[in-house]
């Protein structure tokens, strides 16, 4: 079994990356393969050229970022975890770019992610967690994924790198 996680933070060692490292340890301890993609700040937006949709290629014509690698890994994975920091009440711009392209190339129409298991978590300082969480869930819902929930929302609080790891309740939910 394999889970692919997409880290929507442009910060390499930010709270989202640190929380995903804890998740990695838990998942791998259970014998499940876990791969994290962090596209960083250099992600191009979808151009709505529909090449991926019209050709069924499952690839984006834009090839100078890692989105095609993410698309391929998500198609092969058994589960997908979308993880994002809250940026001004929603997902970060680079995460939006990744999800737009993933959804068009592998979701809508060709629906390679149909019935894949998906989960979401977000890191935040204070507010915007529910809105961000709903954006991530909405993307998975639109791709007809099976969404895993918990007894609490997937939010871990912390502003500066490392603070999220101190949110005991949030970390318990994430792990």
Q: Model-derived features: where do they sit?
A:
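Short, glycine-/small-residue-rich phosphate/pyrophosphate-handling segment
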Residues: 93-94, 108-154, 169-173
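N-terminal beta1-alpha1-beta2 submodule of the flavodoxin-like/Rossmannoid cofactor-binding fold
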Residues: 1-108, 158-175
